[in-house]
């Protein structure tokens, strides 16, 4: 028997996920594990590689329009307001399908939802240049295309959370989610680097064609080698039917009455707000504060740091859980690094700093923020594995909304005060608030069980 956790009532588990037995507190009815839902280790490795590539291409497709916006504006005579309308369309579509995508993934399997959405946004990406030249109403067509891109991509991370909760043992979820985050950072880098070269050499259309083709090829590979002929509907053992029926009757309202759920959502909102603000305003900060600096340095180095940082954070969280440390303790420590230690590197930017110091601080802050992959981002699978996709979608929707609000507030502060210190102070305050709430109210015990107080894995 594995060593017991002491911080949150869970037990460590170092062996195969197929060797575990599940007992439910207050009932103590022995139940068979839902073994057929879990990936074998070789299959898990294949999925990690494919999902890493998928998240990379997802962000390449997402970044294509922002990178090409200047060239497209020149070609179609868009104003700044027109460009903003097109780019903003993605956000509204992205928020629309977060909960729906997660709910569908929980019911029919996240693999199916992810594949169907990938085919859709790959096709739309490849067809974007054709739509742009289809009629004289280019602005309306591109705004609608951008909105639909958000709708199609909005299901990706909720479906990923659902997949992770259903197919991956608890002690390996942090690394999977962190690997997906590192793939998104790589996609941002590739879109900014290779995309800019293609834009200059072959025109803006080439970027959409290339990314759409590669994304379609990825979806085809996913279907041929991992999806075809496989039933991905969540399976249940005979002895787990009673538990499932109770979970099915659990109202959503009961989840929203749980302090750990709101602590997780608020922490995610605060971190998303800080991250989106840095993502949006750091290039302007460097350009205004260090006008002689080389642009590729501060645009590339932080994201190069973020890739190994995300993988390291996920590995560390899984390592300590498998060593027998409490899941709640590990999640809070990872979130402390993602928000608390990150803020320690943001605070110096409020004063006078040299260019090398600013690059180091920003790179460290961006890198540390990825540790959330072993904290709040995977905590939803601890709290409510039966509806992890839908709950993650709810959390991610509010994260995106809060991010847009804080980006706008930061722009207002910069315009009114003509100072960057207020923005970095605001980021620090928001992070401290979210972290404090999560440290006090956060938990890792299941809250989606109507009649049970906790689940103990032996």
Briefly describe each language-model feature range:
Residues 2-60:
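Cytosolic juxtamembrane N-terminal segment immediately preceding the first transmembrane helix
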Residues 46-80, 278-283:
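Extracytoplasmic
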Residues 63, 90-99, 154, 188-189, ...:
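Residue-level signature of mid-helix packing/kink "hotspots" within the transmembrane helices
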Residues 65-66, 258-314, 373, 377:
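Extracytoplasmic gate region of multi-pass secondary transporters
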Residues 119-136, 340-353:
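C-terminal ends and interior cores of transmembrane alpha-helices
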Residues 124, 138-155, 345, 356-373:
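Hydrophobic core of transmembrane alpha-helices in multi-pass small-molecule transporters
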Residues 180-231:
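Helix-loop-helix hairpin linking two adjacent transmembrane segments in secondary transporters
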């Amino acid at each position: 028997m594995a060593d017991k956790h002491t911080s949150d009532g869970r037990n460590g588990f170092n062996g195969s996920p197929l060797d575990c037995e599940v007992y439910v507190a207050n009932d103590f009815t022995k139940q068979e594990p839902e073994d057929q839902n879990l990936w074998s280790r070789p299959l898990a490795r294949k999925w990690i590689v494919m999902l890493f590539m998928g998240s990379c291409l997802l962000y390449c497709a997402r970044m294509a329009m922002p990178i090409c916006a200047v060239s497209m504006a020149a070609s179609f005579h868009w104003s700044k307001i027109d460009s903003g309308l097109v780019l903003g369309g993605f956000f509204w579509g992205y928020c629309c399908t977060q909960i729906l995508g997660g709910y569908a993934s929980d019911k029919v399997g996240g693999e199916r939802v992810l594949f169907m959405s990938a085919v859709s946004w790959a096709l739309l990406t490849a067809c974007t240049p054709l739509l742009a030249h289809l009629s004289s109403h280019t602005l309306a067509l591109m705004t609608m295309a951008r909105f639909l891109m958000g709708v199609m991509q909005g299901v990706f991370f909720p479906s990923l959370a659902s997949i992770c909760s259903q197919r991956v043992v608890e002690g390996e979820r942090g690394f999977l989610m962190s690997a997906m985050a590192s793939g998104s950072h790589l996609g941002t880098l590739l879109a900014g680097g290779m995309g800019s070269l293609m834009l200059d050499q072959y025109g803006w259309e080439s970027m959409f064609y290339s990314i759409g083709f590669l994304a379609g090829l990825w979806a085809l590979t996913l279907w041929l080698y991992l999806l075809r002929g496989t039933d991905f509907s969540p399976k249940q053992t005979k002895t787990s039917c009673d538990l499932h029926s109770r979970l099915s009757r659990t109202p959503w309202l009961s989840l929203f009455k749980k302090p750990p759920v709101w602590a997780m959502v608020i922490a995610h909102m605060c971190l998303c707000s800080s991250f989106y603000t840095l993502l949006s305003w750091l290039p302007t900060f460097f350009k205004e504060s260090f006008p002689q600096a080389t642009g590729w340095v501060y645009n590339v180095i932080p994201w190069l740091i973020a890739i190994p940082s995300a993988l390291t954070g996920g590995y560390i969280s899984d390592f300590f859980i498998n060593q027998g440390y409490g899941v709640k303790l590990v999640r809070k420590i990872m979130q402390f690094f993602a928000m608390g230690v990150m803020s320690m590197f943001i605070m110096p930017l409020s004063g006078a700093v040299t260019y090398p110091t600013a690059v180091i601080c920003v790179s460290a802050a961006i890198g540390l923020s990825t540790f959330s992959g072993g904290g709040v981002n995977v905590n939803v699978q601890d709290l409510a594995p039966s509806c992890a996709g839908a709950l993650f979608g709810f959390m991610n929707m509010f994260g995106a909304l809060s991010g847009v609000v804080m980006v706008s507030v930061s722009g207002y502060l910069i315009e009114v005060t003509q100072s960057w210190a207020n923005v970095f102070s605001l980021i620090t305050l928001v992070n401290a608030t979210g972290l404090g709430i999560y440290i006090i109210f956060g938990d890792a015990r299941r809250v989606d069980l109507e009649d049970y107080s906790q689940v103990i894995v032996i």
